[in-house]
């Protein structure tokens, strides 16, 4: 039931949003790109991590709030598919990310690169959408 509600909310919010959408998350896991296997398969253990993502009604700004910081991301482009919504974003400090709302797996995913150029994927498990 929760997944159906989540799908309905994300579908509506990606096309005809009339209010901000909030997504609370319960855990976080980071995986690194393995050049040999060509997969994100070098992963940390999932850790308990309460955080919230808030997309404004125009879908041009995403805010991520944790217990110790708030980051703002400005949307530069977006694409919608049946089970995915993808945003290209730039953070308030100039870092570029690809953000995926993975409807089927109930995940928010941030893909970026570290200072050495290594690609990582941080996945947040969704607790609630409102």
Residue ranges and their predicted role:
Residues 20-24, 59-61, 81-88, 105-109:
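Short, hydrophobic/aromatic-rich segments at coil-to-beta transitions
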Residues 20-67:
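N-terminal secretory signal peptides
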Residues 63-98:
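Contiguous, well-ordered beta-strand patches that form the walls/edges
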Residues 67-80, 114-130:
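Edge beta-strand at a domain terminus
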